[in-house]
């Protein structure tokens, strides 16, 4: 029996190696040697050669001679349309269809249609053309595969999304009962599995041997596929016709490690049973795990910061510092044990509100210390400091206000479509504009992505004018809350400065009667430390925050004056003509209007593990400790900007060589940002902003500023700028 991967699978075999085919018929001869090799020079082969290379002029002459027409087929039933489709000759396909080519004609050793030939090579522009002219995606070849099955073999997510929007049943089976979900799980394409599951594919469907998609995912052992299926409720104990459970299948195929890892990530033990913690009230608290974990990881850092401060303040320095660090680590260890029961996407502290909780806890302790100790001493004492106290009260109030706004407000999520019909209309429009690619369409949100937007994997939404995802506010910073974020940083800086000054005044007065005995410090410093160690530690801890806040403020000031976001500064702005058009024509072959468009490049990568530059959802490699904290604290952006390597300051950088289409000069850029008429304390209209003094909305801005100001329409090709692309900030 012939298989795609050369493996045998018999109905009675202990474990599957590959879904069985319908017959022993080989797949069509679609290798590069057949496509690109020299064809015989007989007249009946010349028509195929012309179709293969897209020679429309020659084809017209051949038809004019009257010997052949568009319905011609060879002895195997292969038509010119087959060869044009598989070689991505879009213009030739259009020409042949207009000349009456039989669009659903079967041919070749696999007895497949031109649509299936195009789908096998992931030529989704050609696929769309054929579908628009009546190609039937449900026709099967000699092995029982329809177009959706064939498209799944290569894992191209955009092609699968295109086909699903044509009304193809997502659970349609091949000759042996395999669904597209089973094939994508077997092939190890997590992105495809995710698309099918979100589209409603059944995780309980079984093939003729009784295998579910979960059984097939264990063949390749892709943890992402296995985990996603379990998350969507796949039966962990489903038995095949031979009584094989997924656990037995994993053992026979040596994929036990991937199986158990996926179970653990989803909250199950190695036997597939739900793990319930033994601590009191666990069953009640974990009824809504996500809600509980969000609240717990935000509030528990309050305890960690307080415990660390109290231990350090209450003991001698040589003992207090190590014990304080140990106390903080112990509290964090408890949190790590608790989040072991969190949803899969919250199993790491940096993916929870933990960092936001550390800041909020620190802020709370400083405010309480000011109210209980510093305020009374410095406000009503002999040498009162009324104005500094009032200033601190104002700055800290503004810090709290803008911090909450940054955390809870919509950062500028791009609205999703109302249904499948609207999504299909968007896809059809993008294809008509030659823009149906990873940079212009988000397969997770199923929307057209506006300029400067980016899909955030943490928020699972596309954010308009995305700046970065900030773990300290547990939210994205986008067009709606960017200015609030800036004011939060400014007021935080002023709050720390005034708090330090008030603490100094407070300790100076208190130290006059304090003991001057300590281990290593001078008597004058000993009196300050002994006066109120806890207040001194809170001031030191608050001052430490000025390091990352100062760097972040510097970077933000530079970027605002240059009309750039953090993401654009770190990754640059892609040029429209150099990226989008080249990407689109790698999928369309010969253009309908050759003089106006660039030549096609290499074929785009399949989307199994990664289906787009900006919208990549594959697994990232683990970063080192220093690099991870460098990103969390904004040190990497500061170094890039200060060293002149960022897009805002790098003069010779490739990322900056085409200039910034959003910049209108430093003064105008700052005016656009700071004088935005959107209310500071009221509700912000989603996506509203100002660009060059002109109101714009970044949730539906699809043309570059140059095109808009020149009055260009949606089909303008050259000189514009495309959406930014890359991985999460």
Curated annotation (Swiss-Prot):
Q: Which portions of the chain have biased composition (kind: Pro residues)?
A: 592-603
- Residues in compartment: Cytoplasmic: 1-297, 340-354, 405-483, 556-729
Q: Which UniProt keywords apply?
A: Acyltransferase, ANK repeat, Endosome, Golgi apparatus, Lipoprotein, Membrane, Palmitate, Repeat, Transferase, Transmembrane, Transmembrane helix
State its Enzyme Commission number(s): 2.3.1.225
One Gene Ontology cellular component term attached to this UniProt record is: Golgi membrane
Residue ranges annotated as Lumenal topological domain? 376-383, 505-534
Instruction: Give GO MF terms, alphabetically.
Output: protein-cysteine S-palmitoyltransferase activity
Which superkingdom is the protein from?
Eukaryota
- Basic residues: bias regions: 611-620
Q: Which positions does the entry assign to ANK repeats?
A: 76-105, 110-139, 143-172, 176-205, 209-238
All copies of the DHHC domain together span: 440-490
* Family matches, as Pfam families: Ank, Ank_2, DHHC
Which reactions are catalysed by this chain?
L-cysteinyl-[protein] + hexadecanoyl-CoA = S-hexadecanoyl-L-cysteinyl-[protein] + CoA
What sections of the protein cross the membrane? 298-318, 319-339, 355-375, 384-404, 484-504, 535-555
Top enzyme class, one word, equals: transferase
Q: Which InterPro entries match?
A: Ankyrin_rpt (IPR002110), Ankyrin_rpt-contain_sf (IPR036770), Palmitoyltrfase_DHHC (IPR001594)
- PANTHER family this protein is in? ANK_REP_REGION DOMAIN-CONTAINING PROTEIN-RELATED (PTHR24161), PALMITOYLTRANSFERASE HIP14 (PTHR24161:SF85)
Q: What does this protein do?
A: Palmitoyltransferase specific for casein kinase 1.
The record's comment about this protein's domains reads: The DHHC domain is required for palmitoyltransferase activity.
What family does the database annotate? Belongs to the DHHC palmitoyltransferase family. AKR/ZDHHC17 subfamily.
* Name of the protein this chain belongs to: Palmitoyltransferase akr1
**Protein's organism:** Neurospora crassa (strain ATCC 24698 / 74-OR23-1A / CBS 708.71 / DSM 1257 / FGSC 987)
